[in-house]
UniProtKB/Swiss-Prot annotation:
It comes from the Bacteria. Keywords: Ribonucleoprotein, Ribosomal protein, RNA-binding, rRNA-binding, tRNA-binding. It comes from Kosmotoga olearia (strain ATCC BAA-1733 / DSM 21960 / TBF 19.5.1). The keyword Ribonucleoprotein applies. Residues 101-121 have a biased composition (Basic residues). GO terms for cellular component: cytosol; small ribosomal subunit. This is Small ribosomal subunit protein uS13. Residues 97-121 are annotated as: Disordered. The lineage of its organism: Bacteria, Thermotogati, Thermotogota, Thermotogae, Kosmotogales.
């Protein structure tokens, strides 16, 4: 298994698919990385040479925030929203949808399981 920016990439996957296992890299960015490093995206990870792996790794670290660094930035942004007390920060704080979705009958994922009520006889 190839290790790029601290993530083990599965050997049997094509390179452009395997790169999406890295937090912060989606399909479009994976193809862009492979294009700029002159590596065939249809090549399997197990067939990559050490030189190609190091080229990909260097390109990613030089051009993008990924994994822990990106997670920390997102977390800091959310903390800042909470601290300044804006609408989005308040919604994050109380665990409700942030982007204007309706919550009367939906948003179960964000709100958590239903609180059951005890029925009176």
């Amino acid at each position: 298994m190839a290790r790029i920016v601290g993530v083990e990439l599965p050997n049997n996957k094509k390179t452009f698919v395997a790169l999406t296992y890295i937090y912060g890299i989606g399909p479009a960015r994976a193809k862009e990385i492979l294009k700029n490093t002159n590596i065939d995206g249809d090549k399997r990870v197990k067939d990559l040479t050490d030189e190609e792996i190091s080229r990909i790794s260097k390109y990613i670290t030089d051009h993008y925030k990924v994994e822990g660094e990106l997670r920390q930035e997102v977390e800091r942004n959310i903390k800042r929203l909470i601290e300044i007390g804006c609408y989005r920060g308040i919604r994050h704080k109380i665990g409700l949808p942030v982007r204007g979705q309706k919550t009367h009958s939906n948003a179960r994922t964000r709100k958590g399981p239903r609180a059951s009520r005890i029925k009176k006889k």
